[in-house]
């Protein structure tokens, strides 16, 4: 029987307060998170942003217990998936590969080789593909694969995205239905999907399918929810976690919540649609920041649907994805990360100016550089704005 290594890709998160700064640095040093005209700017900007954001981020992590639960939850998902696959007769071993914190992707690759796996299935714990999530993780794994002949020779199957998988859709609808039923009037409960945002240019310039997959996914979930509830509910899709001066996908969660509050929405059921595990963006950003904002805006009852975590139907859906992948052809990391031929995604060490991009992308990049220079002057206390008496 073939020994199958199942690699679960995820973001990672700081487990202690002292990990926050290094985690943020790793995050913003990734050119798929912030794109700059030269790789020489990436690390200095990552240092600057992580330094400036570290204090506020540390406070956020303190508010949820001092660290992210993401690793613990992801490892539990891996164990339960492994157990279920073995019950189905698949000799599988699960490995967690985090992009920006421990256990890093390099660790997963080392363990796969040490355990003598015969083939690999790569399963991102991001239901919806994006350059900045699954795409970045695929590229990192590909970089390691190309540098390691022993790993490169293993057959590999990559699952690009699974936003429309029936098991996932049904599991989400079940968790939403549980909260809708707790509303004062379940027929009028407003379902609010809050997805992690991405820069608008990713979609319009690079052809990132993220927005389309999110929109399709919410439609499928609402259709399944109607089947389970016996009626339709109003719903909204918005995008959270915007960073920097460039335009991101809209509507923004903050603005959408304010509008619903002004409309005197009585029952709001908030769904963290991009996230399959509890972490800082569910426990702090949604549960604390957005709850307060919505309440102040006029929302009466704010309920948040829990993340999937180790919900049994969800784990069964993941097992179905792996089993189906094993029955099909090999799918390379390059193929999984492929985008429409609008913009070439350069290797990180060869990132170049995007001469063929629109002026909006140029403006975004130049704005980021200018914004960085402004922040640097604020920190140093020296520069042209100080010389002119403007600061």
Swiss-Prot record:
Keyword set includes Transcription: no
Keywords assigned by UniProt, alphabetized: Cytoplasm, Heme biosynthesis, Iron, Lyase, Metal-binding, Porphyrin biosynthesis
Positions contributing to Fe cation binding: 196, 281
Catalytic activity: heme b + 2 H(+) = protoporphyrin IX + Fe(2+)
EC code: 4.98.1.1
Protein name: Ferrochelatase
Pathway: Porphyrin-containing compound metabolism; protoheme biosynthesis; protoheme from protoporphyrin-IX: step 1/1
Gene Ontology annotations of biological process type: heme biosynthetic process
Record carries keyword Transcription regulation: no
Gene responsible for this protein: hemH
Subcellular location: Cytoplasm
Uppermost EC category: lyase
Family matches, as SUPFAM superfamilies: Chelatase (SSF53800), Chlorophyll a-b binding protein (SSF103511)
Family membership noted in the UniProt record: Belongs to the ferrochelatase family.
InterPro entries, per database record: Ferrochelatase (IPR001015), Ferrochelatase_AS (IPR019772), Ferrochelatase_C (IPR033644), Ferrochelatase_N (IPR033659)
MF GO annotations: ferrochelatase activity; metal ion binding
Domain of life assignment: Bacteria
Pfam families reported in the protein's UniProt record: Ferrochelatase
Gene source species: Synechococcus sp. (strain CC9605)
Chain's role: Catalyzes the ferrous insertion into protoporphyrin IX.
GO cellular component: cytoplasm
